Amino acid sequence: MKRTATLLVVALILALNTAQAGQLQALEDYYRDVETVQGVFNQFTLDDRGQVIEESSGDFAIHRPDRFHWSYAGPFSQEIIADGERLWVYDVELDQVTVRDQRAVLGSAPAQLLSGDYADLEELFELAETEDYVRLTPRDGGEAFDEARLGMRDGHPSALEIDDALGQVTRVELDEVRLNDAVDEERFRFEPPEGVDVYEADPDEGIR
């Protein structure tokens, strides 16, 4: 569940912007103006009764259009790195790395947000805005989530929620967000540590 939610989260964070007024316009401005995004996060998964069933935290760095590093500090340490060609998922406690062709994994909505433009966004999602957030509803009913909501506060990305087909909600609260700061490019390179098991995933296998 964590890895599925993570790819959705990372992809959708890319659609957040710092503007508060005219949020759809802010999305378009994002694709024009924002290259890097960094910060820390707290992530919660809620069941269909609104009870928290999983909680985690960590930090992230994104370098558009095709690189990111999403790091979970606990309770189960995990690193997810996209280097532009391959997607690495390193489960630290399991001493296990799963690697995939990034283009195959990120080639469809919502992960296509990583490399798309605003026209792609409009093609993939029905967009609606309120005073507090932008709602994204997949045009293709076969996507991995039913709806996402992106929120901004005080001029920076603050939270997003994803409703999945099982009735669960993944909520991510973002803090210490920095836009267009320099990012150490080593964050987007990954060499499996000595002794870990490395698995090449089937190109048609999704993130689970």
Curated annotation (Swiss-Prot):
Entry's localization field: Periplasm
Keywords: Chaperone, Periplasm, Protein transport, Signal, Transport
Family matches, as CDD domains: LolA
Signal peptide: 1-21
GO biological process: lipoprotein localization to outer membrane; lipoprotein transport
SUPFAM superfamilies: Prokaryotic lipoproteins and lipoprotein localization factors (SSF89392)
Recorded GO CC terms: outer membrane-bounded periplasmic space
InterPro entries: LolA/LolB/LppX, OM_lipoprot_carrier_LolA-like, OM_lipoprot_carrier_LolA_Pbac
Pfam families reported in the protein's UniProt record: LolA
Record Gene3D superfamilies: Lipoprotein localisation LolA/LolB/LppX
Family in the record: Belongs to the LolA family.
Known function: Participates in the translocation of lipoproteins from the inner membrane to the outer membrane. Only forms a complex with a lipoprotein if the residue after the N-terminal Cys is not an aspartate (The Asp acts as a targeting signal to indicate that the lipoprotein should stay in the inner membrane).
Subunit structure: Monomer.
Matches recorded under PANTHER family: OUTER-MEMBRANE LIPOPROTEIN CARRIER PROTEIN
Name recorded for this polypeptide: Outer-membrane lipoprotein carrier protein
